[in-house]
Amino acid sequence: MNGVSEGTRGCSDRQPGALTQGHSCSRKMNASRCLSEEVGSLRPLTMAVLSASFVVGVLGNGLVPWVTVFRMARTVSTVCFFHLALADFMLSLSLPILVYYIVSRQWLLGEWACKLYTGFVFLTFSTSNCLLVLISVDRCISVLYPVWALNHRTEQRASWLAFGVWLLAAALCSAHLKFRTTRKWNGCMQCYLQFNLENETAQMWTQEVFGRQMAVIMAHFLLGFLGPLAIIGTCAHLIRAKLLREGWVHANRPKRLLLVLVSALSAGSHLT
């Protein structure tokens, strides 16, 4: 759900973007179908990927919270991984709704369900990204300042930080609660982002609506991808440099971990 659909007056003959990506005015649509021919041709593959992700995500991420709570000692790391697995588990649970949307080719659950579902997806996805950043910073501090970390890293502080991450993610997804709406197009109901509000003049539209659209796009890109990537990359570089100075033979492991995290962030931002 990365990217922003356009529900604007400037293109009255445009199909509003659904849960995925906005469509351009020039895209030719088949009036007898609710999705474009390009999207329709990818439906089987998309459904297979989402179904597999649902099964693996629910089983894998559902096991991690149980293990961290009942089978492991409570530490800063287990607190962070518990919340990370919980966010990913919740995101996995939402995938059947997306599969249902793809099967029906339109949004049939109403406007408030449109707002709540997209807000929920961005809440869990943003929480997962922010927790990856928190884990990376925690690892970096532990390696660079071990004495300070030993005296100040506590489970209680980790829990408060994790709670703060959830609040930050909730703030990031608030735009979907405000601007998400539904609209019929060619007889098919779509769930999309509508940036022009009621009682706005044409002059206000150009400035205000475009500003809202760009603000949401930049917030998602900077806070959902580029920002976490920069922080995680910096932490991995600092850890690797410290380990190399100390002659650790496995100093390249943080680099490989960074590649895995980058792949996860990139794949997640495009899948959603």
Curated annotation (Swiss-Prot):
This is Putative G-protein coupled receptor GPR32P1. One of its GO terms (molecular function) is complement receptor activity. The keyword Disulfide bond applies. SUPFAM superfamilies: Family A G protein-coupled receptor-like (SSF81321). It comes from Homo sapiens. PROSITE patterns: G_PROTEIN_RECEP_F1_1, G_PROTEIN_RECEP_F1_2. The keyword NADP does not apply. It holds the Pfam family 7tm_1. The chain crosses the membrane at residues 47-67, 79-99, 117-137, 159-179, 214-234. Glycans are attached at residues 30, 199. Residues 1-24 are annotated as: Disordered. It is found in: Cell membrane. Residues 68-78, 138-158, 235-272 are cytoplasmic. Residues 1-46, 100-116, 180-213 are extracellular. Disulfide bonds join 114-191. Its main location: membrane. It is a multi-pass membrane protein. Orphan receptor. InterPro entries: Formyl_rcpt-rel (IPR000826), GPCR_Rhodpsn (IPR000276), GPCR_Rhodpsn_7TM (IPR017452). GO terms for biological process: complement receptor mediated signaling pathway; inflammatory response; phospholipase C-activating G protein-coupled receptor signaling pathway; positive regulation of cytosolic calcium ion concentration.
